[in-house]
Every structure is written in C-alpha cells, then in structure tokens.
C-alpha cells in the first residue's frame, strides 16, 4: 500500500484544516452579503407597494444586477436611452445615471439600491411609453381619455420571463402617425441645430406684386421650410404665391396665396414652437388606445374638420364649427359610439343656456325668444303668461325649454347622436356663414357640421341601398324621426395641432383652446426638454 510522503500529508492536512476553519467564515460572509443586498433592496422598494410585493414573491431574485442579468440589463439601458427621441422626460429613467450607478456600486447594499432603481426606471418607461407621461384630465378637465395603464405585475412578469428586447419592443407605439411624428421631431431638431428658418418676415402682411426686403425674407423663410426652391427674385411672383398657398393649406389657413396678417404670423412661428407641438402630439398619440383601422369618425378640433376614416384613409370629410374658446363651452376631447341620427330634431335647450342666456331675456320681456317653448318636468308646454320669470333665479328656475322642429331650429334638420355625459353631438345648423371662416369656434360645445345631409347619406348608405331617398322622405314629413344605425360607429373628438397629412407631410394648426401650451408646460415640468435649444 502506498502512503503519501510526510511533507505532502502535512500540506493536505493543512488544506483540510483551513477549509474546515474558513468554511463557516466564508458562508457567514456570503450570508452577510446576501442579507445586506436583501435588506437594501427591501428598504429601497418599501415606498412602492407593487415593487416591494414583486421582490417578496420572487424571494428577492434579481432582474438587473445579477451576473445572469446582463442581457436584460443591456436591453433596458439601450431602450431608455431613446427617451429623448420619444419626447419623454429623460430624468425619470436616466440611462446614463443608471449606468454610472451600476459601475460605482461597491457594496451589496449599493447593488440592492440600484436593482430597485432599475425596476422603477423600467416600470416608468413602460407606463409612459404605452399610456403617456401625463394624467391628462388632471391637467385639463376638457381632456377625457381612458388611460389604460398596464399593471406593474404584468410588466415585471413579462420582462422576467420573456426575451428582453422583444418585451421592450412590444411596449413601443406602432401607429403610423406616431412614427411620422418621431421623424418630424428629428427633422425639426436638425433644423434648429442648423440655425432654424432664418429671419422672420418684417411685415404684417404682403401680397402678390409686392417687392422689397420683407418679400425677400418671406421667400427665404419658405425656402428653408421646404416650400420653395432658392431664388434671387425680390418680388412676390407666382412661384412665391404658390409656395404661400401650399403653406396655407398645410396650416389650416384660407389658401389664397396672399400673405395676410394671419399667414405671416404663422410663417413667423419658429421651429422651436413647432417642435413643442410635435412633442405634445406624441404624448397625445400615447393616449390613443383604440383601433384606428376600423371605420370611425375623427373630429380634430383645431383642424375644424370631421372625417370618416377607414383603414387609415378618409372616406368622407366636412368642415365643422366647434365650441367657443370660453370656459364651459370648449368642446371636450373624448371617444364614444354613434348610435342613431334624428331627422327634423327638436332642440332641448341645455340648462346652462336657459339660465345664462334665455332667463335674463325673459325676465325683461316674457315674449322674448318666441321660437322657444317653455316646458314643465313632464315635457308639456307651459303658457308664458302663467310664469312670473322675474320671480326665479338661475338656481330656482324649474322649467325646461325646447325648440320644435323648424327651418330655423338651432340643430338644423338633423343631428347625429353618440350619447355621452358631456351632452355633445354633431348636428346641422342654420348659421351656414360660419363655415367660411378660418377659425371656427362659435358653438356652445357641440359640433356643427357643414355638410350634414351628405354625412347622413354616407352613414345610411352602409345599411340601405336607397340612403338618399329614405333620408329625404323622412325629412319631408317635417316630423321628428329617429333612425338607428345598425352598426354603432366610434366617434373620436381629438386635439392635434401637429399631425401628418395623407401624404405624410406635417401639418400644423393653431392651439385654439391653449391646451397644447398647458400640456407642454406639464411635460417640461416633468423633465422633457427641447433638444438643441438653449434655455
């Protein structure tokens, strides 16, 4: 039998002895480090119930900071590094700061804190990208959107169990409009970095045939905007007139080729302001949680137009008048479903109009607004002579009011109903001249339609072969007639001051209600910045 040499035996004994002595110490150190990591993670996550619950249920397994998490960690850092491209607030998920934190984490306690910070960044990124960085109705009560945020547990389960890059790609908005807005954002940032669109036009208005420095400035600015080829011509010629017309069409202006006061004002708006509009539009796109491939009515309030859209294409279009830019009369942003139309409608006067407009008139003259009926709670007409209007206040007035079907009815000859808590609908109007105006904000909130009969024919054509004849027959009776739509039609009242047209070119509209300015302020406060713009 062979025995180890004495010196080898002593060395082996020493190693065995050392292992026996050090094993408890090494195990104790490992347990201590694990405890430090867990304690740090738990303490850091304590302020966020969803994150704390996730780590408790997974026995504090790492998502980002373990040696096996490299792919997931790299995918997240790469994704959140694009926050600026989306017009999102970089500080919420600062990839650079997280990278530094990872590189400088010296202790298990540091690693526990970084683990939670990366989870917070991931959840914030996922929520903001899929449902927006803002809660719109908290910022403006006129923006009524159902913001459907994905539950943190769902997001964490996906990233823990799925391919990291695929999960992060799944979060990205996919609409063509969003992609085009991102492209426009990059283009505007490049334009700003290159010096913008040059000097503003030093004139209040210009017309074909004019000459001089202001015309040169107008030409140069339109060249930089891409509406005109470079030229040394100093006069307002046909080429410049065509460029002005194209600009007007892209900005919702009366397209007459003359650079009037409104046109010059729009031309003088800088790329920085347009960039703000695009960033706000990106945020609004993130709120759009509905299928735009199905047939629907799209009313873009600042565009003063309603369209029937199907598979991304316009199949019907009409001008509209929207609510006045005063409190309680601005048209809200929301979505619902059109269920029916009413031909020869009566008009149930809204309570706000009754007490603010009609009651004061009737208190001065009981025969005022003679086209309006006073009605009781059962809908019965009340003789005016039996009512002492002066005895009532706005709060105590017990009657309603109604305008029967007539040529002068405030709702015209047809209204299109998508019942909602805002009491907003589309309707005809006897006030046709307002549709010729550039800015069409004159109603009490409802949407007046320039071509209501054509809209009715279009809607009915989906359920009958004789749409026009059937509509006219009901109209000729003079009686109030309800026609149900066999298939309800989604209606979306939206507010985009920047959006791509059918050819993909960016178009801009006035911020008629000032909502974009308010949203930009909120985004800026959250940490969104204009790239390349010095503050």
What spans do the regions from the language model cover?
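Short stretches within intrinsically disordered, low-complexity N-terminal or propeptide regions
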Residues: 7, 25-29
């Amino acid at each position: 039998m062979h025995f180890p040499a004495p010196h080898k035996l002593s060395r082996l004994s020493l190693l065995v002895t050392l292992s026996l002595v050090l094993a408890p110490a090494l195990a104790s150190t490992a347990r201590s480090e694990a405890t430090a990591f867990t304690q740090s993670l738990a303490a850091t996550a304590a302020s966020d119930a969803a994150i704390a619950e996730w780590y408790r249920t997974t026995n504090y397994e790492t998502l980002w900071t373990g040696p096996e998490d490299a792919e997931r960690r790299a995918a997240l850092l790469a994704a959140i590094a694009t926050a600026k491209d989306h017009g999102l607030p970089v500080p919420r998920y600062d990839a650079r700061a997280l990278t530094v934190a990872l590189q400088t984490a010296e202790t298990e306690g540091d690693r526990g804190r970084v683990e939670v910070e990366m989870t917070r960044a991931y959840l914030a990124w996922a929520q903001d990208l899929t449902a927006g960085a803002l809660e719109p109705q908290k910022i403006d009560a006129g923006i009524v959107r159902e913001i459907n945020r994905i539950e943190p547990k769902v997001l964490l389960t996906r990233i823990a169990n799925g391919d990291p890059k695929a999960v992060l790609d799944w979060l990205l908005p996919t609409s063509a409009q969003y992609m085009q807005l991102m492209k426009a954002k990059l283009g505007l940032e490049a334009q700003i970095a290159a010096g913008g669109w040059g000097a503003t036009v030093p004139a209040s208005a210009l017309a074909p045939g004019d000459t001089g420095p202001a015309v040169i400035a107008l030409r140069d600015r339109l060249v930089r905007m891409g509406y005109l080829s470079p030229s040394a011509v100093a006069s307002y010629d046909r080429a410049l007139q065509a460029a002005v017309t194209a600009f007007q069409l892209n900005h919702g202006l009366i397209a007459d080729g003359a650079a009037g006061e409104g046109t010059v004002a729009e031309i003088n708006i800088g790329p920085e302001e347009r960039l703000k509009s695009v960033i706000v539009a990106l945020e609004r796109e993130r709120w759009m949680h509905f299928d735009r491939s199905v047939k629907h009515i799209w009313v873009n309030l600042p565009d003063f137009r309603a369209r029937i859209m199907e598979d991304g294409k316009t199949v019907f279009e009409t001008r509209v008048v929207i609510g006045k830019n005063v409190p309680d009369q601005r048209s809200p942003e929301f979505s619902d479903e059109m269920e029916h139309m009413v031909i020869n409608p009566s008009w149930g006067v809204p309570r706000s109009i009754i007490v603010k407009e009609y009651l004061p008139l009737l208190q001065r003259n009981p025969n005022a607004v003679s086209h309006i009926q006073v009605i009781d709670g059962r809908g019965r007409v009340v003789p005016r002579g039996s009512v002492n209007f002066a005895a009532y206040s706005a709060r105590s007035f017990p009657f309603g009011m109604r305008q029967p079907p007539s040529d002068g009815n405030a709702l015209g000859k047809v209204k299109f109903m998508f019942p909602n808590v805002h009491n907003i609908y589309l309707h005809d109007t006897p006030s046709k001249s307002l549709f010729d105006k550039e800015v069409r904000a004159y109603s009490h909130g409802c949407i007046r339609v320039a071509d209501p009969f054509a809209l009715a024919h279009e809607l009915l054509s989906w359920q009958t072969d004789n749409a026009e004849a059937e509509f006219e027959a009901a109209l000729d009776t003079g009686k109030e007639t309800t026609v149900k739509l066999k298939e309800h039609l989604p209606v979306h009242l939206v507010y985009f001051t920047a959006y791509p047209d059918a050819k993909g070119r960016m178009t801009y509209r006035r911020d008629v209600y000032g909502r974009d300015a308010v949203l930009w302020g909120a985004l800026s406060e959250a940490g969104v910045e204009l790239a390349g713009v010095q503050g």
